[in-house]
Amino acid sequence: MAALMTPGTGAPPAPGDFSGEGSQGLPDPSPEPKQLPELIRMKRDGGRLSEADIRGFVAAVVNGSAQGAQIGAMLMAIRLRGMDLEETSVLTQALAQSGQQLEWPEAWRQQLVDKHSTGGVGDKVSLVLAPALAACGCKVPMISGRGLGHTGGTLDKLESIPGFNVIQSPEQMQVLLDQAGCCIVGQSEQLVPADGILYAARDVTATVDSLPLITASILSKKLVEGLSALVVDVKFGGAAVFPNQEQARELAKTLVGVGASLGLRVAAALTAMDKPLGRCVGHALEVEEALLCMDGAGPPDLRDLVTTLGGALLWLSGHAGTQAQGAARVAAALDDGSALGRFERMLAAQGVDPGLARALCSGSPAERRQLLPRAREQEELLAPADGTVELVRALPLALVLHELGAGRSRAGEPLRLGVGAELLVDVGQRLRRGTPWLRVHRDGPALSGPQSRALQEALVLSDRAPFAAPSPFAELVLPPQQ
């Protein structure tokens, strides 16, 4: 059975072995550790922290001896002064070793893969990619998160399916991987506790955008899974953390480099997030669209991203000779129904009534909609003029849906799972004035004037001829010698 390993009891086998030679869990930070004020001063003044310094700081965070002000000061010093690759690698490793580790059967060593996204609007890739990879022979122990702010959370989307349970123990995760080949679960407090503390502190100290801290947060949570390979979807654009491709590339290179230094093969895909991914935004609506993609249909941009990311993972983990061959295998899993079959198994294994799981995975789009939460009202917006759709801005659309109850402003806030929006047009399509271009699903009264204006301003029209919408995929950053 899968087990949680406490610090000091050993580490998962390679390639998930990131403990370092002679290291078992989080070691004593130093025979004579520096005091926290001295560490903060060093980094504030642009100094380089040693391994003992970083491990001492992480140990103080976990054992409670670091005060909140000291944690915030260190985070700001790192944000302003940065960290080199070795410092970032040590921080990542120390965070990962601050809690318990997942351990899997030796036979699974090369099968374990996962994906992470920096967050976007309409991003339902994980719902499709995990079962597609399982259908290709992988094991996918996906530990995911909830939405906060304008981006949606994978766990929230799955919880729009009645009965789906995201709380699973390590032992239950192994059963799920045996039965379905994949699982999508929430973060356990036993795993990477130091990251949980630092993440909360970053959120209130304006240090969320620090590259070393982002890298350590992402990779520490993946290292404990004992993966063979990881792909990270680094988004850029108007609704992403990074406004442009250059900044996203900097994070991508850091993720790949730190992963390589810790024995984890990481690829990072740079993808555009100016418009929503696919045509649907909102929890239940995105589940419907994910099912459509697993029918072998659905929006081309969603399918393209699923096959691109999946192809990279199959290549990195040795399940395909090239990225293109891997992408073709993922596409075949979408077209032949095997990905949908794995999704049905995952639903049933994670608490969904088997009859409901079967109905969702075998029903028509109209039948599926009857089985998932639905908003009480629908409201369509009309094109204000003739023109070609240049862009549908994702950020204002997401912010209005957030106001309507599709998002949360604080942890634990309830969601309206049926609230969302459907794009009725594609980028590059010619529109006539008065044609419906957006359908809003709402529980409350009609859209307010400011909400309607914000949505209409999200639609960008031009006079140019119709054109084929570009793929959101821009670039793939690979590990050395790959």
Swiss-Prot record:
It catalyses: thymidine + phosphate = 2-deoxy-alpha-D-ribose 1-phosphate + thymine. GO terms for cellular component: cytosol. Pathway: Pyrimidine metabolism; dTMP biosynthesis via salvage pathway; dTMP from thymine: step 1/2. It holds the Pfam family Glycos_transf_3. It is an enzyme of class 2 (transferase). Residues 1-10 form a propeptide. Residues 1-36 are annotated as: Disordered. GO terms for molecular function: 1,4-alpha-oligoglucan phosphorylase activity; growth factor activity; protein homodimerization activity; thymidine phosphorylase activity. The keyword Acyltransferase does not apply. Disulfide bonds: none annotated. Its EC number is 2.4.2.4. The keyword Iron does not apply. Substrate binds at residues 116, 202, 217, 221. GO terms for biological process: angiogenesis; cell differentiation; chemotaxis; dTMP catabolic process; mitochondrial genome maintenance; pyrimidine nucleobase metabolic process; pyrimidine nucleoside metabolic process; regulation of gastric motility. Keywords: Angiogenesis, Chemotaxis, Developmental protein, Differentiation, Disease variant, Glycosyltransferase, Growth factor, Neuropathy, Phosphoprotein, Primary mitochondrial disease, Progressive external ophthalmoplegia, Repeat, Transferase. R-A-L-X-X-A-L-V-L repeats lie at residues 393-401, 453-461. R-V-A-A-A-L-X(5,6)-L-G-R repeats lie at residues 265-279, 329-342. The modification Phosphothreonine is found at residue 6. PROSITE patterns: THYMID_PHOSPHORYLASE. SMART domains: PYNP_C. Belongs to the thymidine/pyrimidine-nucleoside phosphorylase family. May have a role in maintaining the integrity of the blood vessels. Has growth promoting activity on endothelial cells, angiogenic activity in vivo and chemotactic activity on endothelial cells in vitro. It is linked to Mitochondrial DNA depletion syndrome 1, MNGIE type: A multisystem disease associated with mitochondrial dysfunction. It is clinically characterized by onset between the second and fifth decades of life, ptosis, progressive external ophthalmoplegia, gastrointestinal dysmotility (often pseudoobstruction), diffuse leukoencephalopathy, cachexia, peripheral neuropathy, and myopathy. This is Thymidine phosphorylase. It comes from Homo sapiens (Human). The gene is TYMP.
